[in-house]
């Protein structure tokens, strides 16, 4: 993603949200628009790799390791909900990762994470689409509209990333010439 200036969409959800029938084919919609999607269970786990994104937090003792979420959620009881919070923290630190946050059936275990995840992603300005209660009514048409709107947002975000990279490169080149 970084090498190609691509945006990857990280799915925050329960294991069943990877099922097209349960996620109303929302991942397929994004893939048909050219976006790669990644389940939070497939996100990087290598500590050396993760330290480039969590080094300051560890150095300042906000957390003990890149996997620690106690700085934002001290008492967590659900493994899956804790994984969602950690994945949001990772996405907030990686400029090429956007988030799709799904929940179904007013999931009680995930309810405590809604505000935490929203705060993490909002503070970092990480592009994110939240589809809570995805099974409410018959969301097919409204989901397609939201997917296309979010895809446009991601395209604009990707352009800004590319422009920033180009500006940084040009600045370095100019400084080397002086």
Describe every region a protein language model picked out:
Residues 1-178:
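An N-terminal assembly and electron-transfer interface module characteristic of large anaerobic redox
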């Amino acid at each position: 993603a970084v090498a190609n200036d691509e945006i990857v969409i990280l799915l925050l959800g329960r294991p069943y949200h990877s099922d097209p029938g349960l996620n109303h084919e929302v991942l397929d919609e994004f893939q048909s628009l050219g976006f790669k999607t990644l389940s939070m269970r497939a996100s990087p786990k290598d500590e050396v790799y993760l330290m480039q994104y969590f080094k300051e937090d560890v150095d300042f003792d906000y957390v003990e390791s890149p996997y620690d979420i106690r700085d934002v959620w001290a008492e967590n009881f659900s493994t899956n909900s804790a994984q969602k919070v950690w994945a949001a923290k990772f996405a907030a630190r990686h400029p090429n990762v956007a988030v799709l946050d799904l929940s179904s059936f007013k999931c009680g275990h995930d309810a405590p994470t809604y505000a935490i995840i929203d705060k993490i992603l909002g503070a970092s300005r990480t592009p994110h689409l939240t589809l809570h209660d995805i099974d409410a009514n018959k969301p097919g048409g409204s989901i397609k509209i939201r997917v296309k709107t979010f895809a446009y947002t991601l395209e604009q975000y990707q352009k800004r990333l590319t422009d920033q990279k180009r500006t940084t490169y040009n600045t370095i080149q100019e400084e080397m010439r002086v």
